[in-house]
Structure formats: structure tokens, C-alpha cells
Regions:
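Periplasmic/extracellular, small/polar-rich flexible segments of pilin-like filament-forming proteins
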Residues: 57-164
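N-terminal single-pass transmembrane signal-anchor helix
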Residues: 1-32, 40
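Conserved hydrophobic/amphipathic alpha-helical signal-anchor segments
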Residues: 22, 30-69, 79
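Short linear sequence motifs
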Residues: 18-22, 47, 96, 133
Length: 164
């Protein structure tokens, strides 16, 4: 008596594995992207608090703007958190660039602003706080990959805008 699998049995197993991976991979990718966005939201909440402390201590700039992150040598000590280390930045001028995002935090004469743009340009998270106001957060998506990330933030007080 012969033992083993027939060609048909092997093909059926390969087909089932293919179907399962075709269904699971997009769900996995979406979950990973939402996790990245959640990490950014958490880190940028620290940036909001740090920018608020900066304004309380030094006030809004009289003219122009003050970059609060980056690595051009002039921003050291502007924030009371080591945001560049937390975001794992590489050297850059006015922005902090990590593996997945490019960050910018600054204050000008009337407001503070932060943004975190996904390096593949599928979505951008940003927030603005004018004098005496509160942080207004928004998420803008450019494609199908960014849309679920922004929609996941909708119920948390974020305004959503997109171009799919």
C-alpha cells in the first residue's frame, strides 16, 4: 500500500493557504498602519504639551516662527522632552524624519502647529492651537491606505478630509 499525498490533495492545501493569506494580509496591513498612527498620536500629544509649556515659559515669537524639533543644531533645549530621541529622528533641517514619518513642530506669532506625515504620503496627521484656543486636530488621507487610519480617528475628536 502506497502512503503519501496525491497531487490533487497538495493543490487543494496550497489553494486554501492562498485564499487565507489573500484575506488575512490586507487586514494585517491595515492593523499595522493603525498601530503606527496610534503611536504617532501618542508621541505628538507629548509635543503638544511641550509646545504649550514652551509658550507659557517664553511666549509666542514676536515675529517669524520657532521650529521646536529638527536637528540643525539651533533647536537644542527648546522643548522639555527629548522628542527627537523618542521619534528616532535622523538628521534634518526643520523636520524630524524617522523610518515611517516626517514630523514638524513649530510656533509662530499667533499659533503652534505640529504635523506628522506618513513617508509614503498616504496620510498626514496635524494639529493647530491658536492663542487662547485648544488644539484642533485633523487627519488628511490621499489614498485607500490612509483612509481607514483617518476614519479610525474620527470618533476621537479629529476632523477628517481626504482625496481618494
Amino acid at each position: 500500500m502506497k502512503q503519501g499525498f496525491t497531487l490533487i490533495e497538495l493543490l487543494v492545501v496550497v489553494l486554501i493557504i492562498g485564499i487565507l493569506s489573500a484575506v488575512a494580509l490586507p487586514q494585517y496591513t491595515a492593523a499595522v498602519e493603525k498601530a503606527r498612527a496610534t503611536e504617532v498620536v501618542t508621541l505628538m500629544a507629548q509635543a503638544e504639551r511641550a509646545a504649550d509649556m514652551y509658550v507659557l515659559e517664553k511666549g509666542y515669537p514676536a515675529s517669524g516662527l520657532v521650529e521646536l524639533v529638527g536637528d540643525n543644531g539651533s533647536k537644542t533645549g527648546k522643548l522639555n522632552i527629548d522628542i527627537e530621541a523618542a521619534l528616532k529622528c535622523t538628521k534634518g533641517d526643520d523636520v524630524c524624519v524617522s523610518k515611517d514619518f516626517a514630523y514638524d513642530v513649530y510656533c509662530d506669532t499667533s499659533a503652534c502647529h505640529w504635523s506628522a506625515g506618513r513617508n509614503n504620503e498616504s496620510y498626514v496627521l496635524s494639529a493647530d492651537r491658536s492663542r487662547g484656543g485648544k488644539w484642533e486636530r485633523s487627519c488628511y488621507y490621499n489614498d485607500k491606505e490612509g483612509k481607514p487610519v483617518c476614519m479610525g480617528l474620527k470618533g476621537q475628536g479629529w476632523s477628517i478630509d481626504g482625496n481618494e
